[in-house]
Regions:
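Amphipathic alpha-helical assembly segments
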Residues: 3-244
Length: 244
């Protein structure tokens, strides 16, 4: 436990810029949160730093929110450490697209994990779709090769507004089912993957895992339920923050 406390103090000073005494005061709560979420002290320090930049809540309240998020992720059937570490390694993406204290990207992280993806791959798809001219050109190429219309306008809109979970669902809707994907030629699969900023391997995994685990609608419903619960928890956290 002493090592965990020392690691917590180091991360707090490096990531939050606190004095030695302030870091010591926060270190026990910090170490407990790291253990509860499966994050290293360094990862948690990054997560807390980016959340602090978007919230007026105290650090203690934010640490409690992080633990609550971890509990919700686990309730959704995903390992909290997997999603938390993913977010900690994509702090710039988190800062750019986070809404509601980052709940939208936590929801996206859960959806991505269920599809066998990481936040790196969600980021890649987001950036590809938002490179509008290139994205539209690739969409047209994929449509030509597939012999059917691919329309990623909705996916682009969702990406732009920070709904990455919805974006992935829309991408899968455009791709089609597992049987349809299996019948495509290499060039068709490659063009389709390119149009959404993915690889054939990752797109295949998405289609396979979506088909194996649930329908797209079921995934969306579970994501929406998690989001509503997280929203309620965020509102409670904000209420607490008013009195701290």
């Amino acid at each position: 436990e002493t090592q965990e406390i020392k690691a917590a103090q180091t991360s707090i000073r490096e990531n939050l810029g606190l004095s030695f005494q302030a870091a010591a005061d926060l270190s026990l709560e910090f170490a407990r949160t790291a253990a509860a979420t499966g994050q290293s002290a360094e990862e948690l320090g990054k997560s807390l730093s980016i959340m602090e930049s978007m919230s007026g809540a105290s650090r203690e309240v934010l640490l409690n929110q992080i633990r609550s998020n971890a509990a919700m992720i686990e309730a959704a059937g995903v390992a909290p450490a997997q999603v938390m570490k993913d977010i900690a390694s994509n702090t710039e993406f988190f800062a750019e697209f986070a809404r509601d204290g980052g709940q939208n990207l936590i929801q996206a992280g859960v959806a991505a994990a269920k599809l066998g993806l990481s936040m790196d791959q969600v980021k890649s798809t987001t950036e590809s779709l938002l490179s509008f001219e290139e994205s539209i050109e690739k969409q047209m190429e994929a449509s030509l090769l597939l012999g059917r219309q691919i329309n990623l306008d909705r996916a682009r809109q969702l990406a732009l507004t920070g709904d990455q979970a919805g974006m992935m669902e829309e991408v899968l809707r455009q791709v089609g089912g597992e049987a349809e994907f299996a019948q495509m030629t290499y060039l068709q699969r490659k063009a389709l993957a390119d149009s959404v900023g993915s690889t054939v391997e990752n797109l295949s995994r998405m289609v396979r895992n979506r088909s194996a685990s649930a329908t797209a609608g079921t995934l969306a419903e579970s994501g929406d339920a998690a989001h509503e619960t997280q929203k309620s928890m965020l509102e409670a956290t904000n209420d607490i923050a008013k009195y701290t």
